[in-house]
């Protein structure tokens, strides 16, 4: 067997778009687990070490001596070892179908004390003959689409513990909730004691949402239509999004209801320490927050004695995490807030966390085009149209949520505003680091929320 340890991991990993160590100096990368799936295919877990003492573990499926699809040959080629070339197997013509067959047969593969378990969901049908291609979407994982039947998400940066995306999709699918793509199968590396808490989730297969449109694309198209019709109100424009926002509110409420029914609810204190810690760390990096910090802190502190109902939620909900099929809205990617520890991503929270995420996303959809045009501070008419669009869709979403659940988010206005503020503070930190030109969007919202 060719030794994957001989491949140039330290050179190849930083070139991948799912690599999470860009702000750290990589000091070394080598395989810690190697499990042969067949003679020319290895499952490899690579440990990447950084100068700050941190470590990430990445999953790479290595196919040997099999040329990848030509258009991907550069990104897929890892390197040579023992006169053979190793490729990222997900870009191979045939390897993804083989991986799907392992899930279909609930196969087990083991080597050197490591055991990889593949599992199919009850009554699931996997498209074993379908053609596969890698999605070109920017992701922290890699998704392989099998015709219009299934999507295979391979986790790249992996960790032990119960994966919330698998967990919640399984719960919602088995409960028959219509607003998720059904889970078809999974695979994982068994933990030391064989329990789910110590296992290493590695990937999942769900139904593919055929003929679906992303919520973000639909919303921004609606905004462009509104901007193009300067003499019409939002409800008069052909691309009005309010009806879809209402239905999205219904879908989110339905998902929340199923999660509450199956996994339960409890009472907890408002997470004042967490939001204050985020505010403090972000304000230290974003000087523009300074003038608002005291007011935000005061708003959070007022909720310190508040008892809230918490349950499992999506955790990172926005318009890029929802798909509109011909039948309904689907919620996808239940992994929680990126970069947070697993235990925090699985922690119960208020459903208002998800509501606030969608409301914040409306702001981005409306004001994003102004930022891209550089006119957010100069074109007062377009800014007013953007505000009109935001308010119309906020109202529609909350109306839909209230109609489906019997709970109106606006009845908890101070708590909802606090979750919106917390999200906007997070956005300010993100934009300051990655897209300074977009910083005015969260700052505008923070100014509005603190003035209310």
From Swiss-Prot:
It is an enzyme of class 2 (transferase). GO terms for biological process: carbohydrate phosphorylation; glycogen biosynthetic process; trehalose biosynthetic process. The keyword Kinase applies. It comes from the Bacteria. Pathway: Glycan biosynthesis; glycogen biosynthesis. InterPro entries: Kinase-like_dom_sf (IPR011009), Mak_N_cap (IPR040999). It catalyses: D-maltose + ATP = alpha-maltose 1-phosphate + ADP + H(+). Its EC number is 2.7.1.175. Keywords: ATP-binding, Carbohydrate metabolism, Glycogen biosynthesis, Glycogen metabolism, Kinase, Nucleotide-binding, Transferase. Belongs to the aminoglycoside phosphotransferase family. Monomer. Catalyzes the ATP-dependent phosphorylation of maltose to maltose 1-phosphate. Is involved in a branched alpha-glucan biosynthetic pathway from trehalose, together with TreS, GlgE and GlgB. This is Maltokinase. It comes from Mycobacterium avium (strain 104).
């Amino acid at each position: 067997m060719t030794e994957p340890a001989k491949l140039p991991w330290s050179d190849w990993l930083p070139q991948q778009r799912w690599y999470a160590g860009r702000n750290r100096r990589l000091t070394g990368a080598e395989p810690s687990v190697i499990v042969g799936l067949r003679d020319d295919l290895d499952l490899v877990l690579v440990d990447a070490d950084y100068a700050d003492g941190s470590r990430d573990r990445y999953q790479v499926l290595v196919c040997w001596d099999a040329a990848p699809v030509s258009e991907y040959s550069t990104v897929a080629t890892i390197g040579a070892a023992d006169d053979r070339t190793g490729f990222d197997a997900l870009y191979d013509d045939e390897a993804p179908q083989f991986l799907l067959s392992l899930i279909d047969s609930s196969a087990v593969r083991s080597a050197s004390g490591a055991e990889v378990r593949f599992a199919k969901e009850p009554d699931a049908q996997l498209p074993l003959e379908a053609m596969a291609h890698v999605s070109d979407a920017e992701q922290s994982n890699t998704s392989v689409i099998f015709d219009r039947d299934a999507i295979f998400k391979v986790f790249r940066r992996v960790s032990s513990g119960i994966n919330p995306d698998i967990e919640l999709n399984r719960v919602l699918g088995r409960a028959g909730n219509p607003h998720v793509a059904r889970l078809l199968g999974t695979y994982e590396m068994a933990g030391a004691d064989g329990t789910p808490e110590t296992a290493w989730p590695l990937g999942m297969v769900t139904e593919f949402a055929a003929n679906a449109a992303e919520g973000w694309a639909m919303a921004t198209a609606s905004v462009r239509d509104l901007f193009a019709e300067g003499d019409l109100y939002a409800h008069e424009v052909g691309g009005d999004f309010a009806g879809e926002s209402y239905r999205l509110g219904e879908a989110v409420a339905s998902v929340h209801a199923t999660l509450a029914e199956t996994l339960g609810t409890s009472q907890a204190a408002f997470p004042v320490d967490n939001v204050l810690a985020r505010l403090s760390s972000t304000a230290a990096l974003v000087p523009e927050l300074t003038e608002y910090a005291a007011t935000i802190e005061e708003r959070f502190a007022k909720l310190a004695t508040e008892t809230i109902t918490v349950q499992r939620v999506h955790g990172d909900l926005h318009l890029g995490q929802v798909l509109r099929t011909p039948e309904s809205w689907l919620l996808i990617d239940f992994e929680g807030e990126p970069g947070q520890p697993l235990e925090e991503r699985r922690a119960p929270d208020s459903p208002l966390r998800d509501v606030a995420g969608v409301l914040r996303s409306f702001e981005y959809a409306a004001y994003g085009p102004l930022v891209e045009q550089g006119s957010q501070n100069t074109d007062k008419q377009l800014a007013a149209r953007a505000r009109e669009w935001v308010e119309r869709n906020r109202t529609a979403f909350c109306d839909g949520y209230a109609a489906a659940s019997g709970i109106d988010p606006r009845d908890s206005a101070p708590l909802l505003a606090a979750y919106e503020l917390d999200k906007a503070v997070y956005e300010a930190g993100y934009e300051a680091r990655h897209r300074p030109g977009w910083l005015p969007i969260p700052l505008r919202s923070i100014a509005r929320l603190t003035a209310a």
